[in-house]
């Protein structure tokens, strides 16, 4: 199969590597039909989180299940599914909350060096009943991709921002997560949303969605617009020292700063005394992806939550390097990139998913026969 791998800062390529094996009896293998290039992927691309060896990238995937373990109950071969970007074990008390971040064994993210990357022809997914959801009726591919990460993150940011009806909210950073947070803030009752970014095109996009655009840094402008009071809630969807400082300066006394932007590995000096004296609540979170699905899917199906237009560019998987280079520019016109592996490349000469699965099983039997012959064991009997 093909997979997008990173060799170092500013260098990604499409690599050919072995197809993934079924990751245990509770896992599935997904033939990826769409994968997103996320802002978090750009952190790897820009060298903020260096790897010691090439790593397959991507954590947002939609695709068709081509193999499922015998313990999988909620999905099956042939189902079109979305895969949570954050994986948990699925069985611990933390995972029982449907929040993978609470996993007692520690959440894992696809495309970060431990699990496989979603920007590939095939993706092995462990604990599939916890990680994977069959795409409901009325949900588009683009919406499903957003549900795997960005929309879940933006929604969680708004939930944790203590937004009350009629309040003023600021969203710093108008990438995909920030725009999803903007939409979510309105649904949670905000009367005014200040949309903050450096890129003119992104500010214009936010204005068409009903927000008040403000170039960053925005604290002084927000204070002036609120007669010196400050925003009731501020969502930091950037994750830099500058954006965090702007958020803390823009929030009112007693307000809440909700941080979902991914910071680098350097420590940030939190002004603890200022937060104490102004009674500021500071919260940070990763996306509780699976927990948000029952809330977000009905909103999307009803049309109350509209996130259309966030994915602006679609490219074949082989043009991933072009997508990363363009995404790095962070223009106002091209916001999010969708990579499309060709299912014909996944299936090879096999025309159907069923035939592809049959061939994979035959290959597994052949492999076991070879192993068994070396040990004096009948291969097929090992499958029983």
From Swiss-Prot:
Keywords: Metal-binding, NAD, Oxidoreductase, Zinc. It comes from the Bacteria. It catalyses: a primary alcohol + NAD(+) = an aldehyde + NADH + H(+); a secondary alcohol + NAD(+) = a ketone + NADH + H(+). InterPro entries: ADH-like_C, ADH-like_N, ADH_Zn_CS, GroES-like_sf, NAD(P)-bd_dom_sf, PKS_ER. Binds 2 Zn(2+) ions per subunit. Belongs to the zinc-containing alcohol dehydrogenase family. This is Probable zinc-binding alcohol dehydrogenase Rv1895. It comes from Mycobacterium tuberculosis (strain ATCC 25618 / H37Rv). The lineage of its organism: Bacteria, Bacillati, Actinomycetota, Actinomycetes, Mycobacteriales.
